[in-house]
């Protein structure tokens, strides 16, 4: 008898939940931006592949902001520049938060990973710590090391152009290992330490894919013993790895042998910054996670664009020849005089944005936009792929056309922006370091080489990995030296 009554109450409870859920959905739907219809209970089906491309198609149909529903989760996708500014920049204070990511953040990262840290005290202290080491004046101090590694990239491409993607990855890994841990020697992707970090990042990349784990739709699963227990194990392994790396710097500091680095700064200021050992370990590791593959992918896109758009490449080279010539190599000091290089980089960012789908934000208050209400708790995706294809700002968006970034005087336009580094208070903390990397590698690569395709292996400009941060699938390039004795000229500069 008792069991029957309990069952009755459970069924009534479930029905009540269902009905109130439906009523809530109907109420919300009336004020939300429009979107494709979905199942009355489960909502829309997340795209299986390349969600940013599917979302860009939906932007064409439903407009600058459209709504999707996944179970109880409401997602607004922003696909036009002005709407992104209105919602994610002007309302930055209310959109700093991240959506709850149970599998990727709470289980795999034990809540420590900055990328998924919700708005609040932990995020504030994380970003404060980064700001000190990555703001423009601090970023400028990394220029010499970036230059040295960029020079290695050029020499690697000269001697072994087949492995150009690996050389770009080596550049990026070397720079972030220097900033993160003070490692001064070049870092190879085959280093066991880097391989271990990459194993962890590869796992994250799988777990973070929309719809990868049911627990993100049904949070109760987190508490079911045995459910996705490998995620907890992976999380423990990752924390142990970052702790080992931070402890190595701690030991160097004790022996007075440490190079200046982000980890050293965190350790020396741990108490003042209010960081636990685990937070400190994860934060030091974040530089590699966030800055390595992204930078390498952008460098790869730069070479891809140069090979596929030879006339555009030649335009940059004409300016390099005029300003720099061939007796010396370009340096950071030439930047002001090389707007064609900067325009090329800006177009690389727009044409194939590395963080193509953007990193989701979450509203912590109702936001009124264009007569619609984006309610508190909505996930907001700034779809960078679609924003870079905004026809009002970027006509013929599929064309790689750096000239769109230049004004009639050949200077960089200050009225055109593209948010490749994200939005508002969540904007990428490494943007200045990344800009420096892209500038110097582009300037040196286009000064040193005529980069072209192998006619026998034409490049597919849409062949990219289907991952949270996209990167080109392997492609073949030819590096034809434009400067006599590149090696000697580069060495002379360093002497
Ligand atoms: C071309 C290279 C890069 C691109 C395209 C890029 C892009 C991005 C984007 C789109 C975000 C998310 C912003 C948002 O939520 O709106 C982000 C976050 C982040 N980036 Fe970068 N990034 C690059 C390089 C770097 C580098 C070199 C570092 C470190 C030295 C770095 C560190 C971070 C960190 C720590 C975050 C998380 C910030 C947070 O969640 O509060 N990134 N980046």
Curated annotation (Swiss-Prot):
Residues the entry annotates as binding heme: 428
Organism listed in the record: Postia placenta (strain ATCC 44394 / Madison 698-R) (Brown rot fungus)
InterPro entries named among the record's database cross-references: Cyt_P450, Cyt_P450_CS, Cyt_P450_E_grp-I, Cyt_P450_sf, Cytochrome_P450_fung
CDD domains recorded: CYP64-like
EC number: 1.-.-.-
Membrane topology per record: Single-pass membrane protein
A GO-annotated cellular component: membrane
Superkingdom assignment: Eukaryota
Name by which UniProt lists this protein: Cytochrome P450 monooxygenase 113
Segments passing through the bilayer: 2-22
Pathway: Secondary metabolite biosynthesis
UniProt-annotated location(s): Membrane
Principal localisation: membrane
